[in-house]
Amino acid sequence: MKRTYQPHNRKRRNKHGFRSRMATKNGRKVLSARRAKGRHRLTVSSETSNKK
């Protein structure tokens, strides 16, 4: 039986990346909540950037 989680980095970036979060109002709400909480990584796309 094929399992539900079939990871692909491109799909991950496109769905949960910074640009897709900024594209919607609720996505921006997510980012601001994560900033307020003091998260080290805001999105999955910030994991491999130079900003670490």
Swiss-Prot record:
<keyword id="KW-0687">Ribonucleoprotein</keyword>
<dbReference type="InterPro" id="IPR000271">
    <property type="entry name" value="Ribosomal_bL34"/>
</dbReference>
<feature type="compositionally biased region" description="Polar residues">
    <location>
        <begin position="43"/>
        <end position="52"/>
    </location>
</feature>
<comment type="similarity">
    <text>Belongs to the bacterial ribosomal protein bL34 family.</text>
</comment>
<feature type="region of interest" description="Disordered">
    <location>
        <begin position="1"/>
        <end position="52"/>
    </location>
</feature>
<dbReference type="GO" id="GO:0005840">
    <property type="term" value="C:ribosome"/>
</dbReference>
<dbReference type="InterPro" id="IPR020939">
    <property type="entry name" value="Ribosomal_bL34_CS"/>
</dbReference>
<dbReference type="Pfam" id="PF00468">
    <property type="entry name" value="Ribosomal_L34"/>
</dbReference>
<keyword id="KW-0689">Ribosomal protein</keyword>
<dbReference type="GO" id="GO:1990904">
    <property type="term" value="C:ribonucleoprotein complex"/>
</dbReference>
<dbReference type="GO" id="GO:0003735">
    <property type="term" value="F:structural constituent of ribosome"/>
</dbReference>
<protein>
    <recommendedName>
        <fullName>Large ribosomal subunit protein bL34</fullName>
    </recommendedName>
</protein>
<feature type="compositionally biased region" description="Basic residues">
    <location>
        <begin position="26"/>
        <end position="42"/>
    </location>
</feature>
<dbReference type="GO" id="GO:0006412">
    <property type="term" value="P:translation"/>
</dbReference>
<feature type="compositionally biased region" description="Basic residues">
    <location>
        <begin position="1"/>
        <end position="19"/>
    </location>
</feature>
